[in-house]
Amino acid sequence: QLVGAKGQALGMNVLSVVHRNKPEGCECETMHFVTMDELLSQSDIVVLCAPSGDKPLVDAESLAKMKDGVVIINVSRGANVNEAALLDALNSGKVKAAGLDVWLSEKDPNWALASHPAVSCTPHIGAGTKEAQKRIGAELVDIVENFG
């Protein structure tokens, strides 16, 4: 939701796919909820903020449905991206750029992908917002207070 709100503040038309009902309390009243195929074919930038599923959200099949020159950002789980397919798409120009905060293997990242000139990497800090840290602190206090 926060990614969508920030995109809207920058004037972006934000599309979202949810596999459940629209999130309760979603502040993005102008966010458009669409199918995955609609999102893939219409988006200039695809931001992954989803838990891991049965298969990667970004693979050769989904990349083929995307616009040429798409930008892909993954701040969720490394398993959501087929790294070999993304590297092929970057090399062919199908994907213009990628921002990656997570890897399939954090201990042994795909160095060909990490060193690609069109890839920007961060060390798994996508969830390190002030808001997230406050929530973590509150949860820890709750755990300590209710211990035993």
Predicted regions mapped to residue ranges:
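Glycine-rich adenosine-cofactor-binding loop
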Residues: 1-8
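C-terminal helix-to-coil terminal segments
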Residues: 102-148
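Residues at the starts of beta-strands that form the adenosine-phosphate
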Residues: 12-13
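The conserved SAM/SAH-binding core of class I Rossmann-like methyltransferase domains
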Residues: 17
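Rossmann-like adenosine-cofactor binding region
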Residues: 20-111
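Alpha-helical hinge/cap motifs
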Residues: 1, 77-78, 124
